[in-house]
Regions:
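N-terminal secretory signal peptides that target proteins for export/translocation
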Residues: 1-4
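Bacterial N-terminal signal peptides
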Residues: 8-20
């Protein structure tokens, strides 16, 4: 666990003076891709400590807007690249990596994407491969666009979309969607083919930090320590995030 010393020390000291004793709740902002793991661990944390944890967030831009507005927040979970550029968050503790998944419309034939060759063949054969428009600035969108720009994926019919890639499956714009795996797995209208093969390192690193607007940085840090406890690695894995070192 790592927090920049000058900033975090000052923040923790202020929080110690400002926070009400026995704070009974925490607000956590998280994008949908990391939410299943955060939600599962939040329930365990509440059972262990009695501290209620509320999960909010949604899309990247919505989280940024909430932080900029100084709304209620104690802990923030974001792709590491986004968290680095977010002044409203103090410190950065790495969590792990979430893989990009391959999904098709529920009821459609699910392609075999278990090897690099089979993955490439499935994408080339598709009438359209949807993914988040990289112009929107999301880490997943930029990563997937870079992957599909490689010479070996020449001929893939790319369908960059605004918002969630899986919406293009329902509209018929594409028959394959590349999106963060937990998001695909959580949608009943999508059949998950699996993750992009590891050879392509198609995953987004996530980290967490303390929101500058928190009124209890000590409790926020305690929750972050719980999130990164090695004993909770299995919970993360079951919800689509592979902790670093596992």
């Amino acid at each position: 666990m790592w927090i920049p010393r000058p900033f975090s020390a000052a923040l923790l000291a202020l929080a110690w003076l400002a926070a009400p004793a026995g704070a009974a709740s925490l607000m956590v902002l998280s994008p949908a891709s990391a939410a299943p793991g955060v939600r599962a661990l939040a329930a365990l944390y509440t059972a262990k400590t009695g501290i209620a944890v509320t999960l909010a967030g949604g899309g990247r831009d919505k989280i940024f807007a909430a932080l900029k507005a100084g709304g209620p927040a104690d802990v923030v979970v974001l792709p590491t690249n986004d968290l680095v550029d977010t002044p409203s968050v103090a410190g950065m503790t790495p969590l792990g990596r979430i893989a990009v998944g391959v999904g098709v419309k529920a009821g459609a034939k699910v392609p075999d994407v278990s090897t690099p060759q089979k993955f490439r063949s499935a994408l080339v054969a598709a009438k359209g491969v949807a993914y988040a428009d990289p112009a929107a600035g999301t880490s997943a969108g930029k990563l997937i666009d870079q992957l599909l720009s490689a010479p070996e994926f020449k001929g893939v019919r790319r369908v960059p979309v605004q918002g969630l890639a899986m919406t293009a499956l329902a509209s018929g714009q594409a028959d394959i969607a590349l999106q963060m795996l937990p998001e695909l797995a959580a949608n009943k209208e999508v059949a998950l083919a699996g993750p992009v093969p590891e050879n392509y390192v198609a995953g987004v690193d996530f980290s967490t930090g303390i929101a500058a607007s928190t009124t209890d940085a000590l409790q926020a840090q305690a929750f972050i320590d719980f999130l990164t406890d090695r004993q909770n690695a299995a919970v993360w894995k079951a919800n689509g995030l592979t902790p670093f070192g596992n």
